[in-house]
Amino acid sequence: MRYYNYLTTPSGKTCNLYELKNKDYIILLKFLNGENFEGFYKKLNSLIVESIPNFFELDIIDKAYLYVAYFYYSIKTSINIKAEKFDAVEVPLTILLDSLEENYNKNILDYKFYKWDDCKVSYPSRIILKDNNIDIDYTSGLKEISEHKLTTEEVRYISENAPLYDLNQLENFITNNFSQEIYVAKNIMGIKDIKDNMINPSLFYSIAYIYKDSLEHYYNLLYLVCHYIRVQWESLLEMTPVEMMILYNNFIEDKEAQNKKHSKNKTLNLNDPNVADMMMG
């Protein structure tokens, strides 16, 4: 089941924002890892066109708003269910190590752990990108794409000023920083000056910047679900982020219920006179 959010764009148009699948976000992440921001934009653009029939009627601010909304509603919301911060998805060390011991496969996995404290770890984030089907989709998207390069100053400005998680600021940010004027010669079909908002390399980067760090952690979350809960990878790819997190949360709730039941049974056994006599020797 694909969930959707009913969204009103800055221009007042309404649409149903259907979730992308996990495999779609992984393909987007591959473009970002290669710093191919135009490829990222074109892939995201094609995915949104499929789910929003009137996409081509939207202006650039509405489109950019939708790009960020996909991130905001699917990735940010999913990660925040169990982790308020974006710096990591955390799990207890003992649980993770037990899971890794059961699932370790030297042919495809290369584990490298970074211990933060006594009970938290981070885990690798380059495992799943080797999936063959995803590679085919990714490389086919590269054929007609040429990369745009930004200056160091442009990158610095965007990284310091882009409204990463605030949809309310996005319209002003795009309007103020990325508007361009197109002047068409008056003798061409009698058209006078045209003013429009154009998509340029800086806009590719600003949208990509919003996705990049959180997609890395979202990728780690996929790894956690796949190997901790032991969901088949093919099934996980076809899920959406919300479906994945529902599965994960149900698993956690079941685990907690089992632990409480085990703890309760252990307490009851200690109150058993026979058990007490045995303990006293």
PLM segments and residue spans:
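Short acidic DE-rich linear segments
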Residues: 263-281
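An amphipathic, hydrophobic-aromatic interaction surface with interspersed Lys/Arg
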Residues: 1-264, 281
